[in-house]
């Protein structure tokens, strides 16, 4: 057999071999198509181990039937396939014993959700008309043949509850919830749907029958507290009124004392004003302060102790200009310098800073002479010249 005529070997699964020796254009297009649009291949054609296509023989190695809680015994497998419900978990096996017993009955899987603990009320007899029965799963419920109701709640617990007004509200809110769940899970136990809806009010009325007196006593407590609060408020109001009366009497007494002092010392009112201004703020009210100021302050009341004197240095009547005044200290120094007996003592007694003339003399127009170097005899004719120049009536003045 000619090796050249032998067929080419088959490519491995998942691969495609294209020969480009015959038609380059067509084969090159097929190469791009095979890359851009690969053909789906079967799982059987892929290189996979044989165990991938075989189902497990037993459930000992699977997650659905773990042996960590069944004591090494594989759990039973349902006919429909793998068991997805983990009924052999550790909590279930610890509570119900073995895994086989837990999976025997589907109804017993939820038996551990509601367990009845021991209670002292179990030893007490049921009230008249009540009967206790059990369901198929062992849960007990109570029948009231008088009112035709069915409930999960033990009527003996309501009788032994302490007489507390605050504990009745949680019982009201939590009673209808287990009854509705009972109606859904065990519909054959509900004798009448209408009586079931009325069960909560009727049961509460029967439970609250022996506890009518304590709420009445509790309702009277707010009234007693309110009365006590009213008495405290009255006492507090009386104390405030008495304190206000004492303050008013003290204010009147201070006003009388002040008026008496003002009558005794009318001429010294000006000297008392600063003292009163320092004493009045911490001890007297604003009303009293206004009265005090009006009666004793000479600058505000306009009384007989003070009159407005005529001002001689305000420049009234001088037109649009004003004559600068000579300070009193300066004139007193001039008088002392003119006296003959004090002429020898003047250089020693007068302070050099006090002999310095005021600054406004330097600002006068037309005076380019240092006024600080002039003597008193030279200043007198200078002031006369300035005054005569200011008193001229010419509208236009020429300063030299």
Curated annotation (Swiss-Prot):
Keyword Repeat carried by entry: no
Top-level taxon of the source organism: Eukaryota
Leader sequence residues: none
Annotated region described as Required for interaction with PALS1, given as residue ranges: 222-400
Residue numbers carrying Phosphoserine: 62, 89, 105, 295, 311
Biased composition (Polar residues): 61-70
Domain notes: The PDZ-binding motif is essential for stimulated gene transcription. It localizes the protein into both punctate nuclear foci and plasma membrane-associated complexes.
Assembly and binders: Binds to SLC9A3R2 via the PDZ motif at the plasma membrane. Binds to YWHAZ in vivo and in vitro through the phosphoserine-binding motif RSHSSP. Interacts (via coiled-coil domain) with SMAD2 (via MH1 domain), SMAD3 and SMAD4. Interacts with MED15. Interacts with PAX8 and NKX2-1. Interacts with TEAD1, TEAD2, TEAD3 and TEAD4. Interacts (via WW domain) with PALS1. Interacts with LATS1. Interacts with YAP1 (when phosphorylated at 'Ser-127'). Interacts (via WW domain) with PRRG4 (via cytoplasmic domain).
Record's protein name: WW domain-containing transcription regulator protein 1
UniProt organism field: Homo sapiens (Human)
């Amino acid at each position: 057999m000619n090796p050249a005529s032998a067929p080419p070997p088959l490519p491995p699964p998942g691969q495609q071999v294209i020969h480009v020796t015959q038609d380059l254009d067509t084969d090159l297009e097929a190469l791009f198509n095979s890359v851009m649009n690969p053909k789906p291949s079967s799982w059987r054609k892929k290189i996979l181990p044989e165990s991938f296509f075989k189902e497990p023989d037993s459930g000992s190695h699977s997650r659905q039937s773990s042996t960590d809680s069944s004591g090494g015994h594989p759990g039973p497998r349902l006919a429909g396939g793998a068991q997805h419900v983990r009924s052999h978990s550790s909590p279930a096996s610890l509570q119900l014993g073995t895994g086989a017993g837990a999976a025997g009955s589907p109804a017993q899987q939820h038996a551990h959700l509601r367990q009845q603990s021991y209670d002292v009320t179990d030893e007490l007899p049921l009230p008249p008309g009540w009967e206790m029965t059990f369901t198929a799963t062992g849960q007990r419920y109570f029948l009231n043949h008088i009112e035709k109701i069915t409930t999960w709640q033990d009527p003996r617990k309501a009788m032994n509850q302490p007489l507390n007004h605050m504990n009745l509200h949680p019982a009201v809110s939590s009673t209808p919830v287990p009854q509705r769940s009972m109606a859904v899970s065990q519909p054959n136990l509900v004798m009448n749907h209408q009586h079931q809806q009325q069960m909560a009010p009727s049961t509460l009325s029967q439970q609250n029958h022996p506890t009518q007196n304590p709420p009445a006593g509790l309702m009277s407590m707010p009234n007693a507290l309110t009365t006590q609060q009213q008495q405290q408020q009255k006492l507090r109001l009386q104390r405030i009124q008495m304190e206000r009366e004492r303050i008013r009497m003290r204010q009147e007494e201070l006003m009388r004392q002040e008026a008496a002092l003002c009558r005794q010392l009318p001429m010294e009112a000006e000297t008392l004003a600063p003292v009163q201004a320092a004493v009045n703020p911490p001890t007297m009210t604003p009303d009293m302060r206004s009265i005090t100021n009006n009666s004793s302050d000479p600058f505000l009341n306009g009384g007989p102790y003070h009159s407005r004197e005529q001002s001689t240095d305000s420049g009234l009547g001088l037109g649009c200009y004003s004559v600068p005044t000579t300070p009193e200290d300066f004139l007193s120094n001039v008088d002392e310098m003119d006296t003959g007996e004090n002429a020898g003592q003047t250089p020693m007694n007068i302070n050099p800073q006090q002999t310095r003339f005021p600054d406004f003399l330097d600002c006068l127009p037309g005076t380019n002479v240092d006024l600080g170097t002039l003597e008193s005899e030279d200043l007198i004719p200078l002031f006369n010249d300035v005054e005569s120049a200011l008193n001229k009536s010419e509208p236009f003045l020429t300063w030299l």
